[in-house]
């Protein structure tokens, strides 16, 4: 139902499933995922919907906070809402997306790269504006900025904790752009906003495609001043990409609903994961949350290992 764009019917179906079995993991995940894009008008509901509604009502206080302490206080309120759940839900996600209604089909592209040792043609037009920030609180501020940031086009953006062992850095934000010219224009607008939000403006830069690609093909990651010198899709890769699609076609999804521009239940489960990561790397900005139990020990351990290198 969700994939057909029938969101209200999907909510009713998940609602029914959860009323029968409140700890039904798949229904919980699907419900939380759907609530990122849709708020039901009314649900005579399991706790899940009520908590999402409370967090969405709390969201403006975080989005428009004027100090770090205000952000921290409101995060604490939202995290306490999660404790109202009677079941243990652990999100598999670690990135907060504000996605548009276009599926970039990144799963396909990553699989082609990993199985065929080539970069798919689509990815040669993919450019991102990346921002790196020093602390957990700054990552929340960046996420708020991404929710409020208004482009002529609704570009997908995300905030992440870096977990990939061969990629440097900790806290990052990325905006997906269609081509280098758009990325340059977005960076100019973003830099103005970053100056307003942060006392010390974080560094932003344009990168091409996924970070793994230039590790294998360094020329792909180079963005020369003369655009004619940029690496283009090698013709000899075309049959390999075609063969992949013949063997294992991964179609982009239709009927994608854009994310709501606000914090929601899904985000707060991810924020809990970010806090555990921050504890692992010794980030002082989470001092207020230091007594909260670690919910994601695997993330805490990965972060701790990361901080040792």
Each language-model region and where it sits:
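Position-specific recognition of the canonical hydrophobic site in helix A of tetratricopeptide repeat
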Residues: 1-2, 36
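Helix N-cap motif at beta-to-alpha junctions
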Residues: 135-136, 177-184
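Short amphipathic alpha-helices in soluble, non-transmembrane regions
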Residues: 142-146, 185-195
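Short proline/glycine- and acidic-rich turn/helix-capping motifs at secondary-structure junctions
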Residues: 163-170, 200-229
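Charge-rich, low-complexity segments
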Residues: 25-143, 158-160, 223-227, 233-309
């Amino acid at each position: 139902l969700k994939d057909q764009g029938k969101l209200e019917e999907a909510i009713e179906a998940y609602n029914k499933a959860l009323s029968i079995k409140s700890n039904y993991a798949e229904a919980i995940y699907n419900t939380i995922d759907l609530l990122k894009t849709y708020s039901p008008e009314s649900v005579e509901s399991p706790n899940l919907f009520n908590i999402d509604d409370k967090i969405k009502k709390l969201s403006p206080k975080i989005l428009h906070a004027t100090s770090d302490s205000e952000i921290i206080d409101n995060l604490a309120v939202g995290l306490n809402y999660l404790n109202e759940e009677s079941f243990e839900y652990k999100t598999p996600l670690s990135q907060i997306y504000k996605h548009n209604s276009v599926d970039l089909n990144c799963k396909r592209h990553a699989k082609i790269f990993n199985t065929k040792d080539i970069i798919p043609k689509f990815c040669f037009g993919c450019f991102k504006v990346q921002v790196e920030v020093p602390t957990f609180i700054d990552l929340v501020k960046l996420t708020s900025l991404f929710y409020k940031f208004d482009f002529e086009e609704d570009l997908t953006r995300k905030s992440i904790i870096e977990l990939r062992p061969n990629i440097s850095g900790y806290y990052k934000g990325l905006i997906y752009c269609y081509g280098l010219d758009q990325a340059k224009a977005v960076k100019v607008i973003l830099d103005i906003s970053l100056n307003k939000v942060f006392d010390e403006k974080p560094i932003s830069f344009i990168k091409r495609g996924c970070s793994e690609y230039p590790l294998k093909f360094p020329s792909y990651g180079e963005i020369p001043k003369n655009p004619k010198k940029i690496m283009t899709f090698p013709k000899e890769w075309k049959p390999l990409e075609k063969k992949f699609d013949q063997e294992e076609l991964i179609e982009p999804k239709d009927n994608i609903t854009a994310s709501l521009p606000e914090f929601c239940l899904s985000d707060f489960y991810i924020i809990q994961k970010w806090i555990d990561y921050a504890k692992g790397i010794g980030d002082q900005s989470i001092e207020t949350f230091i007594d909260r139990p670690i919910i994601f020990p695997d993330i805490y351990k990965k972060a701790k290992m990361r901080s040792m290198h």
